[in-house]
């Protein structure tokens, strides 16, 4: 495995070396091409510089010739001016001579003078013209012609030279542009040459590193090959010796009597095996050390490469830090602007006028009479917590609690209707007989409740609902509304009546049920049943008794010591509803509404006079509402 890995590494190194050499040769060829281009550009530049020098020399020669021509022109101008001055002098002299001749002629006769003058004039004109012509033709005309010819030739030469100068200037501009282009190309080529030099240097470094690694790997390979050969030869020798010793030991063991030589051979065999194991361990340690050295060398090289990469990354990090600082400054500026905008927004919001006051709170929600029934059921299930519930009864309930209690009460009542209610026995001896006024109200309420509970067990109750009169329902509604007004006024002054009034308001008015219960009640018969001796109460272990048809419950009032929720009826200002506890009482026979009416129809009116109407209506309303909830 090691030899195959080493061969693979050698192949990789050779391939990398060949790639580096090929890249190096390509770069060298490109460098030579760029050098040739640079030499050509230099030659062109030198030729352009030579042409520029020649043009400069020619321009200097032309300028010298132009200066010479200008000097010659100035000389000719001076000669012409001197010739003109001589001509003017000669004209003046001729005029003076004419005047003198005129003076001499004046002494002669006029005819002679006129003739002579005419002759003289003609002669003088001819003489002057001839003298001028002679003067011009002889002395100056040649010079003037020569000068004119020279001026024309000089002007032509001047024009030619001006044209040549313009051409030379345009050529100079072109040459200068070419030189600038050459310089730019030279700079570009120099930059490319520098880049290629850097690439060549990198390639040289890489090639050097590759060559060094290749040489090191070759040295390590040779060392490992030598060590492997030595180890193989040593192992083969030891294997041969071990086989010899095994044979000798086998022969000695075959012999029946062990000799001293056999013991010595065995001892030598043991020693040799120990030496073999020690040398094998040393060989393994050496191999491990060599492998660690190779790994360390590779690690050093990797560390060097990683350091170079770290330097590059640090430079990138510095650039990124600068960008980060700039972005942070921008973010701070933006935050500052955002804070200012938020302050402005807050100021604008603060400056807005305050909102109008909230509307007044809504009136308290109408309480539920089911809550009283729930409290009774809870007292039955949790008698120990009656005191805490009594303290909480004075606090006003919210709408959410009322709805929860309604739901719980309905669920519990449905469960009790389905499964049956386990009622506890009543201890009649523990009833305190104090305050006769309150006992009267309690008895009347109990009578009414018992009669209503009896009517619920009859099958004829559903039929009686259909035969109700609208007049009775209307009168019952009016009576209930009047009673509620009175109880609201009374409970506003008493702390115990707040819950009762709130509960009584939450239940909807059931006029039909109240009318049915009113027509069905016979107070005298109910009172007689209540006062009649009750059957023996069951023991706590017996449980509820099964009745034929249905079970009715007896309504009792317990003192505050046992229940903690007894209420008093006061004739004057304070009124409150009694807390009802349902106790199991086995009825002998289910009485219908007709049977109750047949017993004593005359006692209903007599009992109405004894019981106060307001307390009576409260108890009836409570029984009706509990009855409706059970339904």
From Swiss-Prot:
In its UniProt record, a GO molecular function of this protein is:
kinesin binding
Q: Where is the composition biased (Basic and acidic residues)?
A: 403-418, 590-631
Any idea which residues bear Phosphothreonine here?
487, 496, 537
UniProt PTM:
Phosphorylated on Ser-101 and Ser-249 by PAK1 through a CDC42- and RAC1-dependent signaling pathway, which enhances its association with F-actin retrograde flow in filopodia and lamellipodia of axonal growth cones. Phosphorylation on Ser-101 and Ser-249 is increased by netrin-1.
Tell me where in this chain the PTM Phosphoserine is found. Answer: 3-4, 101, 249, 375, 473, 494, 506, 515, 532, 534
The record's keywords, sorted A to Z, are:
Acetylation, Cell projection, Coiled coil, Cytoplasm, Cytoskeleton, Developmental protein, Phosphoprotein
Entry keyword annotation includes rRNA-binding: no
Listed under GO cellular component are: axon; axonal growth cone; cell leading edge; cytoplasm; filopodium; growth cone; lamellipodium; microtubule
Keyword Cytoplasm assigned: yes
Q: Spell out the Pro residues composition-biased ranges.
A: 352-369
Q: Where in the cell is it found?
A: Perikaryon; Cell projection, Axon; Cell projection, Growth cone; Cytoplasm, Cytoskeleton
Give the similarity note.
Belongs to the shootin family.
Q: How does it assemble?
A: Interacts with L1CAM; this interaction occurs in axonal growth cones. Interacts with actin filament retrograde flow; this interaction is enhanced in a netrin-1- and PAK1-dependent manner and promotes F-actin-substrate coupling and concomitant formation of traction forces at axonal growth cones. Interacts with RUFY3. Interacts with PFN2. Interacts (via N-terminus) with KIF20B; this interaction is direct and promotes the association of SHTN1 to microtubules in primary neurons. Associates with microtubule.
Role noted for this protein: Involved in the generation of internal asymmetric signals required for neuronal polarization and neurite outgrowth. Mediates netrin-1-induced F-actin-substrate coupling or 'clutch engagement' within the axon growth cone through activation of CDC42, RAC1 and PAK1-dependent signaling pathway, thereby converting the F-actin retrograde flow into traction forces, concomitantly with filopodium extension and axon outgrowth. Plays a role in cytoskeletal organization by regulating the subcellular localization of phosphoinositide 3-kinase (PI3K) activity at the axonal growth cone.
The domain comment in this protein's record states:
The N-terminus region is necessary for interaction with actin retrograde filament flow and accumulation in neuronal growth cones.
The name on file for this protein is: Shootin-1
Its source organism is Homo sapiens (Human)
Per the UniProt record, the lineage of the source organism begins with: Eukaryota, Metazoa, Chordata, Craniata, Vertebrata
Name of encoding gene: SHTN1
């Amino acid at each position: 495995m090691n030899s195959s890995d080493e061969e693979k590494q050698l192949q990789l190194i050779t391939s990398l070396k060949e790639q580096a050499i090929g890249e190096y040769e390509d770069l060298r060829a490109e460098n030579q091409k760029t050098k040739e281009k640079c030499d050509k550009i230099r030659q062109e530049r030198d030729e352009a510089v030579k042409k520029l020098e020649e043009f400069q020399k020619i321009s200097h020669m032309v300028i010298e010739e132009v200066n010479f021509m200008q000097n010659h022109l100035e000389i000719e101008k001076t000669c012409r001016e001197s010739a003109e001055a001589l001509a003017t002098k000669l004209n003046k002299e001729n005029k003076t001579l004419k005047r003198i001749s005129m003076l001499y002629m004046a002494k002669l006769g006029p005819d002679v003078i006129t003739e002579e003058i005419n002759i003289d004039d003609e002669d003088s004109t001819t003489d002057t013209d001839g003298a001028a012509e002679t003067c011009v033709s002889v002395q100056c005309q040649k010079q003037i012609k020569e000068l004119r010819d020279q001026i024309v030739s000089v002007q032509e030469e001047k024009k030619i030279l001006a044209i040549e100068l313009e051409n030379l200037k345009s050529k100079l501009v072109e040459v200068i542009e070419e030189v600038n282009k050459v310089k730019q190309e030279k700079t570009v080529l120099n930059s490319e040459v520098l880049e290629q030099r850097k690439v060549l240097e990198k390639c040289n470094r890489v090639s050097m590193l590759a060559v060094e690694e290749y040489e090191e790997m070759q040295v390590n390979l040779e060392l490992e090959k030598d060590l492997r050969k030595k180890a193989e030869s040593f192992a083969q020798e030891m294997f041969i010796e071990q086989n010899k010793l095994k044979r000798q030991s086998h022969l000695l063991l075959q012999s029946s009597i062990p000799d001293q030589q056999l013991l010595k051979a065995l001892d030598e065999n043991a020693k040799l095996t120990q030496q073999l194991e020690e040398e094998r361990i040393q060989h393994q340690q050496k191999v491990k050390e060599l492998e660690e050295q190779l790994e360390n060398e590779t690690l050093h090289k990797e560390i060097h490469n990683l350091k170079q990469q770290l330097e590059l990354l640090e430079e990138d990090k510095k650039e990124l830090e600068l960008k980060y600082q700039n972005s942070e400054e921008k973010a701070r500026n933006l935050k500052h602007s955002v804070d200012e905008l938020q302050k402005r927004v807050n100021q604008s919001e603060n400056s807005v006028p305050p909102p109008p006051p909230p509307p007044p709170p809504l009136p308290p929600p109408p309480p539920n009479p089911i809550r009283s029934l729930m409290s009774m059921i809870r007292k039955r299930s949790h008698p120990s917590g009656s005191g805490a519930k009594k303290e909480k009864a004075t606090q006003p309930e919210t709408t959410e609690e009322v709805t929860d209690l309604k739901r719980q009460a309905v669920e519990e009542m449905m469960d009790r209707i389905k499964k049956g209610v386990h009622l506890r026995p009543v201890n009649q001896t523990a009833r305190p007989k104090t305050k006769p006024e309150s006992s009267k109200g309690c008895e009347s309420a109990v009578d009414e409740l018992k009669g209503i509970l009896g009517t619920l067990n009859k099958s004829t109750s559903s039929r009686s609902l259909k035969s109700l009169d609208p007049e009775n329902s209307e009168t019952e509604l009016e009576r209930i509304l009047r009673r509620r007004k009175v109880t609201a006024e009374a409970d506003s002054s008493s702390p115990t009546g707040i819950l009762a009034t709130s509960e009584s308001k939450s239940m909807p008015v059931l006029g039909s049920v109240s009318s049915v219960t009113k027509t069905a009640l016979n107070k005298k018969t109910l009172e007689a049943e209540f006062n009649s001796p009750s059957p023996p109460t069951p023991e706590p272990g017996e449980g509820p008794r099964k009745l034929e048809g249905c079970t009715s419950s007896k309504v009792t009032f317990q003192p505050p010591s046992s229940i903690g929720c007894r209420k008093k009826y006061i004739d004057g200002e304070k009124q409150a509803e009694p807390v009802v506890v349902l106790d199991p009482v086995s009825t002998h026979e289910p009485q219908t509404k007709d049977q109750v009416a047949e017993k004593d129809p005359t006692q209903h009116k007599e009992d109405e006079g004894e019981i106060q109407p307001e307390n009576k209506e409260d108890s009836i309303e409570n029984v009706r509402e509990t009855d409706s909830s059970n339904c």
